[in-house]
Design a protein with these regions (language model features):
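C-terminal lobe/lid and adjacent interdomain/linker elements of RecA-like ASCE P-loop ATPase modules
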Residues: 1-75, 81-95, 101, 105-109, ...
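Histidine-centered, metal-coordinating catalytic motifs and their short helical/loop contexts
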Residues: 95-147
Length: 173
């Protein structure tokens, strides 16, 4: 029996991919597939980043990842600025990187409501800022639990190596 996954890309086009046997063992498919999408978005070059038409939806995906992970592992219910102390403590974020984590939270939370009354503000957020938020999130998760991130991204060639270069340059850079 062969299994396939059908997803929509950022342009609204359907993508059909074969699902390998290891992926079928992962019971949290939404979390895993979202993790993969965010990781691929974080790895985009500046040239390819400019081609993303619907980059804003990655803010929601980042929030979904962080909320799911924080709630499941650290009983942190809301990943807002009010929970910054809990977040930096749970994820062992160095004090020097706290402001970058705060910017990441501000970015992903401002995008979590989609197109709404604040669309004028949201539409002004550049793709690079959202990508930096994604990189900060992925760095933070890697810093705390690199085995988790490696398991989630094992099919993305070079991800852990690239993620470590973000660490060397500072959070989300």
């Amino acid at each position: 029996v062969t299994h396939y996954r059908i997803t929509k890309d950022v342009h609204g086009e359907s993508e059909v991919t074969k699902v390998d046997k290891d992926s079928l063992k992962n019971y949290s498919d939404d979390y895993h597939s979202t993790f993969i999408e965010v990781a691929k978005f974080a790895m985009l070059s500046n040239k390819d980043l400019g081609k993303k038409v619907n980059y804003i939806h990655f803010g929601n995906q980042c929030r979904f990842l962080l909320e799911t992970h924080a709630r499941s592992n650290y009983n942190i219910e809301n990943v807002t600025d009010n929970a910054i102390k809990q977040i930096v403590s749970a994820y062992e974020v160095p004090e020097s990187s706290e402001s970058q984590v705060r910017r990441m939270l501000d970015t992903i939370n401002s995008l979590s409501h989609g197109m709404s009354f604040n669309w004028d503000y949201v539409s002004q957020i550049p793709a690079k800022q959202i990508q930096q938020a994604a990189r900060t999130l992925l760095w933070m998760l890697t810093n705390k639990d690199s085995q988790h991130v490696e398991a989630m991204t094992r099919n993305i060639s070079g991800f852990m190596r690239i993620c470590r270069t973000w660490q060397d340059d500072g959070l989300g850079v």
